[in-house]
Amino acid sequence: MPGNSFGHVFRLTTWGESHGPAVGCTVDGCPAGLPLDVADIQRELDRRRVGQSRVSSQRREADEVQILSGVFEGRTTGTPITMVVYNTDAKSHHYDTIKDAYRPGHADYTWDVKYGFRDWRGGGRSSARETIGRVAGGAIARKLLATVGVTIVGYTLQLADLRAEVFDEAEIERNIMRCPDARVAALMVERVDQARRELDSLGGIVEVRARGVPPGLGEPVFDKLQADIGKAMFSIPAIKGVEIGEGFGVAMLRGSQNNDPFIRREDGSIGTTSNHHGGILGGISTGEEIVVRLAAKPPASIARPQQTVDRDGNPVTIEVHGRHDPTVLPRLVPVAEAMLALVLADHLLRQRLARVSWSERDDG
């Protein structure tokens, strides 16, 4: 099965299934000498981990990462970095009664029709547990980006019809919804609790911002920065829409409103007075903040009775029991951050190959 790797120079390959022995990843192309230890990876995995609050799946996994290769004496060696997380709390018997049924909203049917065989335990490879490898690889990408001053922050912008009205970055990790608006976060928790009681689930929007991105990243024509960001985000389970900058809002603007005037800043750098473009023009970063929004569907695993068919086309009624997220949003945040970091790290290294010498501005 192809399609398990992402990136050109900084390349991530993930492996493993939800109820298999382990999940993990291999990162290839990371330069030698980057300071890195297990704590750097574990910090991000803990933010993605199941069972961390009442608004996430109650599956109990420590998600403790082991680095198997590519790091020596606290620094990367330049060789492939392989990391593993062992699954310790898979309960496959929860799926015994529905293993031959096609769960609505899941990949059961499409995997069956493509491969003729599938791992029915917790979704197998199509499970969101696969994203552990993305977050682990993204943690390394973030360390690399930090060497040039790039920082990334993500948060829950909207749950159903509840949207953050205040942006307080310090508030994001203070509440279990990872929402920058404390008042709206409390309402979101109440709404999730209600959905869980009603055996239902909720979707919403996560926003991710990258700051300090140097201008010049991106590879026209088919590897435009926004194209790779779109591919990265759409590859995340449950994502049904992606916007960059003003996104679909540009359809309501005139050119005179949407254009961002260029200016020369006091430090001599070139910038814009507004950021409708979301930090990317012509597929190349401008140096402004990169702003990405992801629309996530409500989790498909709900305990309500649902009509479907089995592998033979016979009508059946199923109830998906077990331990599932009533909303993916809080745990989606670190995954989305990781994918943006992977794209930017890859393009940072690609840019260093693009010219004999490179700086943010070259007048020579």
Curated annotation (Swiss-Prot):
Its cofactor is FMNH2. One of its GO terms (molecular function) is chorismate synthase activity. One of its GO terms (cellular component) is cytosol. Keywords: Amino-acid biosynthesis, Aromatic amino acid biosynthesis, FAD, Flavoprotein, FMN, Lyase, NADP. Reduced FMN (FMNH(2)). InterPro entries: Chorismate_synth, Chorismate_synth_AroC_sf, Chorismate_synthase_CS. Its EC number is 4.2.3.5. FMN binds at residues 125-127, 282, 297-301, 323. Pfam families: Chorismate_synt (PF01264). PROSITE patterns: CHORISMATE_SYNTHASE_1 (PS00787), CHORISMATE_SYNTHASE_2 (PS00788). Belongs to the chorismate synthase family. This reaction introduces a second double bond into the aromatic ring system. This is Chorismate synthase. It comes from Chloroflexus aggregans (strain MD-66 / DSM 9485).
